[in-house]
Amino acid sequence: MMLEVPRYTWRSPSNIKVVAEPGLGPGRWLLPGAHQPSCPPAPHQGPLQKPSQSAPGPTASASAPPRPRRRPPPQRPHRCPDCDKAFSYPSKLATHRLAHGGARPHPCPDCPKAFSYPSKLAAHRLTHSGARPHPCPHCPKAFGHRSKLAAHLWTHAPTRPYPCPDCPKSFCYPSKLAAHRHTHHATDARPYPCPHCPKAFSFPSKLAAHRLCHDPPTAPGSQATARHRCSSCGQAFGQRRLLLLHQRSHHQVEHKGERD
């Protein structure tokens, strides 16, 4: 059984009538009036099969698609003058510099806090709604922030390959072991002294939180950022214990009438 291949006729750019005949092979054409070589038809056995791709010949390698080029690293020509970060667009740099300038143009409608970025405000508002969209895959607990979930997942770690040489505790990461030894076992565990009192602290964040005790409380209506505000007079404090001391010492007479 022979396959019938249709005959195609078209005109070339030089206005010559070209006829494609079957059996001439690729790249060979028959002009009208030319003699067509005769060859016996090959017997067809079984269905047509595609050539094997396991061992491609020179023609197959030539027709293979080129490999995709590796994408070059993104260009970040806009560098922050206050830190080492760089950005691709000026708008990204302008948004980043809000963190250095202390500007917080995104206030929370439910509390006096304000934030530099809309994403920080959106994450903060989850604390007011009570939503916990980040569940733990190992226990029923859920968290409002991914960072809280990441900190909680350490409790489910199967191994703790970094033991403390001074106590039976062990840790999942070397950074946690270093922080533990710095806090509990170092002789100079408090290298950050307070400039206003004899106290000293292990970490700069602890010192910064303590220095709020020496700063005067913000007046009512002030734009200064404070975490704990008195509901009676409007004064704000950096720590909750200072707010409780203020309420016991200033508003106990008014509410209970124990003093003149």
UniProtKB/Swiss-Prot annotation:
Annotated Basic residues bias: 67-78
Coiled coil: none
Entry keyword set: DNA-binding, Metal-binding, Nucleus, Repeat, Transcription, Transcription regulation, Zinc, Zinc-finger
Keyword Oxidoreductase tagged: no
Keyword Endoplasmic reticulum: no
GO cellular component, one term: nucleus
C2H2-type zinc-finger residues: 78-100, 106-128, 134-156, 162-184, 192-214, 228-255
Compartment(s) where it occurs, according to its Swiss-Prot or TrEMBL record: Nucleus
Ranges of Low complexity composition bias in the record: 51-64
Pfam families assigned to the protein according to its UniProt record, in alphabetical order: zf-C2H2
GO molecular function annotation: DNA-binding transcription factor activity, RNA polymerase II-specific; RNA polymerase II cis-regulatory region sequence-specific DNA binding; zinc ion binding
Region (Disordered): 22-81
InterPro entries on file: Znf_C2H2_sf, Znf_C2H2_type
Role according to the record: May be involved in transcriptional regulation.
Entry's family note: Belongs to the krueppel C2H2-type zinc-finger protein family.
PANTHER family: ZINC FINGER AND SCAN DOMAIN-CONTAINING, ZINC FINGER PROTEIN 575
Stated name of the protein: Zinc finger protein 575
